[in-house]
Amino acid sequence: VEEKGIYSIEKFLVARRLMYWQVYLHKTVVAAEQMLVRTMQRAKDLVQAGVTVPAPENLSFFLYNNPSADDFRQRREEWIGYFAGLDDYDVMSAIKSWMRHDDFVLREFSERLINRRLFKLEFSNEPFSDAYVAKISQQLKSVYPEAAVPYFLLAGKESNSAYTTFKDEIKMLMKNGQVLPWSQVSDHSVQPASVTKYYLVYPKADA
């Protein structure tokens, strides 16, 4: 990039970081994603326990099978065919049908996703203390069956780095013909360090 583009790149990188935390890693997005993951995990757990879980063919194939690297090598066309055929409609159709499933956890998660009664999400710059997690867990046990609580209390972390200097750094073509890394020529360098936030996701007290 020519030297005159330095500040445009800086503005782009700042906007990129803001987009990640305000859009892609927004609380609502992360909460919904984690709930969807747990819904599928519950469906998979039920199948492995011998419980019938109805789903469209492409999704059902993965619920009732445990693919390995060897499976993809030996039955490549079959596995990839099912994977390529899996889409949002399969997932939403399954979740809608699970709203009437006998299993409480699967039914509860499905109803919440369809009706947008999403879990609360807390972000923290530091890992949550064991005491705090235990406190939330105890509160959930007063509302949900104890065996179901691990599904309703989700913990994890999200990381994002707006720019990295160790791989594929942007190169600037200076007026004198030199080619220098962007981090060396920017007056207001964007911090390359990765930002990590820890989260807890669980049902709201009134929902």
Give the predicted meaning of each segment.
Residues V1-A207:
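Histidine-centered, transition-metal-coordinating active-site segments
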